[in-house]
Amino acid sequence: MAPSFDTLSEQDLHEEEEEEIDVSDLKAQYEVKLEEGLDTFVVIDGLPVVPEESRQKLVKFLMRKLNTVGHTSEDAVFMPVNDKNMSEGYAFVEYETPEQAVAAVKQLHGTPLDKKHTLLVNKLMDIERYGREGRIDEEYKPPTIEPFKEKEHLRSWLSDPNARDQFALYRGDKVGVFWNNKNNPPENVVDRAHWTQLFVQWSPKGTFLASVHPQGVQLWGGPAFSKQKQFPHPFVQLIEFSPGESYLTTWSARPIQVEEGQPILSYEEDGKNIIVWDIETGKPLRSFVSHDLSAPGGESDAQPKKKVQWPAFKWSADEKYVARMLQGQSISIYELPRMNLLGKTSVKVDGVMDFEWSPATVNREGVKQYEQLLCFWTPEIGSNPARVAMMSVPSKEIVRTRNLFNVSDVKLHWQSQGSFVCVKVDRHSKSKKSMATNLEIFRVREKGVPVEVVDSLKDTVINFAWEPNGSRFVLITNGETVAGAAVAPKTAVSFFAREKKGGAAGNFKLVRTIEKKNSNAIYWSPKGRFVVVATVHSQTSFDMDFWDMDFEGEKPEAEKDLTANVQLMKTLEHYGVTDIDWDPTGRYVVSSASAWTHSLENGWNMHTFSGNTLSENPTEKFKQFLWRPRPPTFLSKEEQKQVRKNLREYSKEFDEEDRYAVDIANTAVVEKRKRVLSEWIAWIRREKELLSEDKDAYGLPEDVDDPKKAKDAPAVTSEQGEAVVEEIVEEIVEESEEVIG
């Protein structure tokens, strides 16, 4: 608020008196921080009280605990002694770094020293900060207990009687959530201005909608989208949810500066870039410095700035582990919810370039113990070949490796159920003048994890995508770019499926290749079978091809032995398309052109899975379209089987409901037209009544409106101040046209 006379205090009115000037804000700003330099010290309470001659023995015993979380020495432990030559039951300990002191507080606080004594560990600067005079009220005041408030149902949208889906729209400075109504206009649920400053993002199961602000992240949910949680992270730029919505990761390029008195962030987060949060409690679990922003000392000017790797932390399928990579050196795996390093050490992997968790918990053949799988790759180093490896966690055992040669780049693609991992290997020729791609497919569920090689590709693969919950995939290849060519080379789209071998599936085989395309993106339906292959972020091509992988028509003879029947259903164009999104049911597809990419014809179009356009929605300053995800089904496998068995009966009910909805819509239109007609007739009747009253008032006959009689009627003259009513009628008797000159 801007200062004004109304906001001045009584003391401010007498500011000419020097002794009454309030300089508390200046004192706070320039106050010498006594804790500076003390951030490596901790205070340990709860120690045994021993005589001075036993003090050194106690220190040595205590060192066993202290050195498990950092590095300190006996000389760095100070244990005060009183006048009776007895210790006071506490000690001051100095660690080498502030991080070690923080680790000591986190890991040693509350741990037993022996059967009778429990360690209480605090930072020395905390004692100074919170124990300073005036910081603690000496008089006990009972805490205020807030009245109970019933929580909103965070998954209420799933109980919609018509099983509709919701989506979020971000346009201009407004964010809205809407129901999808098929052919009819969407129904608004909530629409708010300035709801976010950067972007919005749904949580993986659709429970929360996250908005991003300079102060941090807020989560919204429930029928009215009320505020549920907030996570303070100044100038946050990126966020990532864990698969089960238990945790949230936030990142900012600016190191955090924690102000004193901040209720949630502590000195532990000061100077960090990344925070891992517990969504349920709203509290940070641990904070980290971003690897991408730090450069070796003295080399920061010479080295180019690294691209930020996001997500910086990757989650296991069951959220029990989260891992982070220091590129070229190691992979650090943390156990949740404590966020302690698995085995207290990182996994050293020289040259590691990337890693990916399996998106599902996999039961490998012959393996009975619990495990999560992690795949990583390393480049060629000296005479050592490039390597792809699969690691089992928590044992950290390497269960499969594959050596690769002449490697330029590798991309790891897990199938959604963790049954396969495709290693896309870009290889260069010995002369390094040409590139080609081959696929190394790990069959994870089979004994020994065999690897199948697809080496029939002649060009470089620029995009690859597995069918969700399936064993088919689509890829796009790109020919070599001719130096100096003004036009980019054409692409080719290839469809792959497995062979039929008796009752089991065999190797992966090419089904069909579509040449001379401009496609660069692949979007599978979340339910599989249907796929959109499109050209996005292009200035010259905007095609969207809708494909069916299980076409029910006749199958070509050459594809009889393959588990696919590929058919192009429709091709559409959407000028300037930048994004394509499937709804969670796989029935609808939205193509959109975002103002974040360009400012030409922004908006979004709704299509069916087969490519029929339902609506076109040009929207000024359109930015984001996001379908609300659905959680996994709550039905058991037996119940799902029963639903599929009775699907035809359910379909009849759904068709009847659709017809009823159309009838209601038509009835509404008819009723509206009837209402408008009734209003028009009532208005005509009312006007005629008023006109009749006017005729009686002026003594006019009822048939005065007849034009013929009105022409011959004499003018009414005014006598004694009465008004004269006169009607003039003109008629064109003859019309001639004369041309002059």
Swiss-Prot record:
UniProt-annotated location(s): Cytoplasm
GO molecular function term, any single one: translation initiation factor activity
Key words of the record: Cytoplasm, Initiation factor, Protein biosynthesis, Repeat, RNA-binding, WD repeat
Gene: prt1
InterPro entries referenced in this protein's UniProt entry, alphabetically: EIF3B, eIF3B_RRM, Nucleotide-bd_a/b_plait_sf, RBD_domain_sf, RRM_dom, TIF_beta_prop-like, WD40/YVTN_repeat-like_dom_sf
Region (Disordered): 1-22, 695-722
GO cellular component terms attached to this protein's record: cytoplasmic stress granule; eukaryotic 43S preinitiation complex; eukaryotic 48S preinitiation complex; eukaryotic translation initiation factor 3 complex, eIF3e; eukaryotic translation initiation factor 3 complex, eIF3m; multi-eIF complex
Protein name, entry field: Eukaryotic translation initiation factor 3 subunit B
Domain RRM: 40-126
Bias-annotated ranges (Acidic residues): 13-22
HAMAP family: eIF3b
Family: Belongs to the eIF-3 subunit B family.
Record bears the keyword Cytoplasm: yes
Major subcellular location class: cytoplasm
WD repeat windows: 193-230, 232-289, 303-344, 514-557, 572-610
Function of the molecule: RNA-binding component of the eukaryotic translation initiation factor 3 (eIF-3) complex, which is involved in protein synthesis of a specialized repertoire of mRNAs and, together with other initiation factors, stimulates binding of mRNA and methionyl-tRNAi to the 40S ribosome. The eIF-3 complex specifically targets and initiates translation of a subset of mRNAs involved in cell proliferation.
Keyword RNA-binding (UniProt): yes
Quaternary assembly: Component of the eukaryotic translation initiation factor 3 (eIF-3) complex.
One GO BP: formation of cytoplasmic translation initiation complex
Compositional bias segments (type: Polar residues): 1-10
Organism for this UniProt entry: Aspergillus clavatus (strain ATCC 1007 / CBS 513.65 / DSM 816 / NCTC 3887 / NRRL 1 / QM 1276 / 107)
